[in-house]
Amino acid sequence: MIESTDADLAWLLPDEAATAALAAHMAGVLDDGLVLYLHGPLGAGKTSFARALLTALDVGERVKSPTYSLIEGYATRDRPAWHLDLYRIADPGELEWLGLDALADPAALVLVEWPERGAGALPTADLELLLGYAGQGRRASLRAFTAKGERLLARLAKY
């Protein structure tokens, strides 16, 4: 961890292995459902983080990028998980046919890349992860928006 405030945490991640380690740490302290919005430019590591988090939660199958399918569902060791990539969505109304009702399950892990493209159609984020370029590596910052997100942030602060 490189910095901390009451509302957020930040890390410098020198490589993809460090990104995967942060995701694995999150998986280890996750004890409830969570809605996590993933922000960052193309190639910043949103899908890599989501893939590492789902893998650490023992999905037991290859974690695919939902770039073309828009949504992929998984069963982790103790909860349903959904990974959405809304990059190709031009209007949130396009999400109506996806049947997003399952995302409201409080036990579910919901990972959303490009959430701004689904504004108004998505559940509220507990946490948001902002990934950006930092030299050859990445800078990751997490911000909490709910009590659930704040509890997870407190557990992650020990990383």
Give the ranges of each region predicted by the language model.
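Short phosphate-coordinating micro-motif centered on Lys-Gly-acidic
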Residues: 1-9, 55, 90-95, 101-159
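Conserved lysine of the Walker
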Residues: 46
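Short beta-strand-centered segment that lines the nucleotide-binding/catalytic pocket of NTP-utilizing
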Residues: 59-74
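Short hydrophobic/aromatic beta-strand immediately N-terminal to the Walker A/P-loop
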Residues: 35-37
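P-loop (Walker A) phosphate-binding loop of NTP-binding proteins
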Residues: 39-41
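N-terminal pre-Walker A segment at the start of P-loop NTPase domains
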Residues: 2-25
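Phosphate-binding P-loop
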Residues: 26-33
